[in-house]
Amino acid sequence: MPVLMSPEIANKFKEKWLMLHPEDQDNVSGSVHFDDSLTSLHWLQNFSILSANPERTPSSGCHPQHLFYYKNQLGGTDSPSSPPAGDTAATGMPQTPGNPTTSCSSLANPYALQQAGHYITGQTNPAEEIDYKTNRHVKPPYSYATLICMAMQASNKTKITLSAIYSWITENFCYYRYAEPSWQNSIRHNLSLNKCFMKVPRQKDEPGKGGFWQIDPQYADMFVNGVFKRRRMPATNFNTQRQSKMLSSPSSSYTSQCNQQMGMGHFQGNKRKQVFPKRGNKLARISKSPLLTSDIKTSDVLRGDFDLASVFDDVLSGNDSTFEDLDINTALSSLGCEMEPSSQIHNQSGYSNEDEQACAYLEANGIIGCNMEDFHHQQHHQQAQVHPQYYEGMFSDQQNQQHPWEIKEEAQPVPLSLDHGYAFCEGFFSEMQLWERGESYM
């Protein structure tokens, strides 16, 4: 088998190609111009939106005679080459990189276009005012609420019927005259649902059927110069609503009241006759919610922790004199809080009021920063003079009460036997607790 060189292979391939495609006999020299206008996008790089004519409609194009005129005027600059004969796919597409032929304004400068303005027939005139009263093909650019307001103002009456609104719209807008009657349902829905319109019942002495409609006076300013404007909620309105919700809650009202009274106490100095909300009122206010009733005892237990935190804040902020007062304040505040349930047991009104005042003063002292040593001596002196029997009985009850963890079990003697037999082991294991036995781990 002979070995063929590349030129011979090319000649054989050319002969076979011409045998299969006899229409290519005229282009033997290889001067065939392949049209790549369908895939070329070089014109898109040079295209500019600023050079395009915005007033010209997309469907309007340039006549071939106009293109020929521009070619003669400008000397063929940026003008596309004519497509080959019979090539319908390349019509209107550029053969060389450049601007597309569909835009007439991109083919010449403004001066040349001004000279050749009388040859251009594809451009439309500027938008003229549309007469909606006679044009049945263009829908008016007004909302249904605006149409209702326009009908009410055109009637020069305080109230108007629904049929009068229909008749005014069909009389002034030809589009609704020939359109489907579904727009009447939209008019009725706007009258019923829009808060700017209100229905006025018909009086007994007025003839006819149905009620009247009018614009709500508080929303009359929304219809200005034929345009129905919607009100926007100001940014401050949200803040005021949020503040009102926060102030309406019981906890926030209680804290605001305490802050106000603490500020008054700070200016009054060390006066002990300070009025504070009672603890019973606070517990009653919290117990109104059924979900929080189980948390009342827990809050009483954790009250000492919160008092300790407030004392630390006061010491660090400089309200108390030294850190030595910290232990005194903590002890007195915890003592005052524990005195409250004991006063409820005795059911003595005079004693409970005195105890609550002492607790309130102790809490105020932890926040305001009064001298605790002076108060401790005065309070002890008053207790000795006013109610000595009451306080003695109260503290005697506290001394008699013992906590569960303070109760100690008496050690019971275990009978031991000198016999190291089975009896000794049995007696030893019988006295062991349940968690000490080996059976509990099995």
From Swiss-Prot:
Q: Could you tell me where this protein is found in the cell?
A: Nucleus
Q: Where is this region: Disordered?
A: 73-106
> From the UniProt annotation, which stretches of this protein bind DNA?
139-233
GO terms for biological process, alphabetical: auditory receptor cell stereocilium organization; cilium assembly; determination of left/right symmetry; heart jogging; heart looping; motile cilium assembly; regulation of transcription by RNA polymerase II
SUPFAM superfamilies membership: Winged helix' DNA-binding domain (SSF46785)
Q: Does the keyword Transcription apply?
A: yes
Single Gene Ontology MF annotation: DNA-binding transcription factor activity, RNA polymerase II-specific
Q: Which domain of life is it from?
A: Eukaryota
PROSITE patterns, alphabetized: FORK_HEAD_1, FORK_HEAD_2, FORK_HEAD_3
| Keyword vocabulary terms for this entry | Activator, Cilium biogenesis/degradation, DNA-binding, Nucleus, Transcription, Transcription regulation
Mutant phenotype after disruption: Randomization of the left-right body.
Q: Where is the composition biased (Polar residues)?
A: 93-106
Please indicate if the UniProt record lists Transcription as a keyword: yes
Q: Output the Gene Ontology cellular-component terms.
A: nucleus
Indicate the principal place this protein occupies in or around the cell.
nucleus
What family does the database annotate?
Belongs to the FOXJ1 family.
Record function comment: Key transcription factor required for motile ciliogenesis. Activates genes essential for motile cilia formation and function.
- Protein name (database record): Forkhead box protein J1-B
Q: Which organism is it from?
A: Danio rerio
For this protein's source organism, the top of the classification is: Eukaryota, Metazoa, Chordata, Craniata, Vertebrata
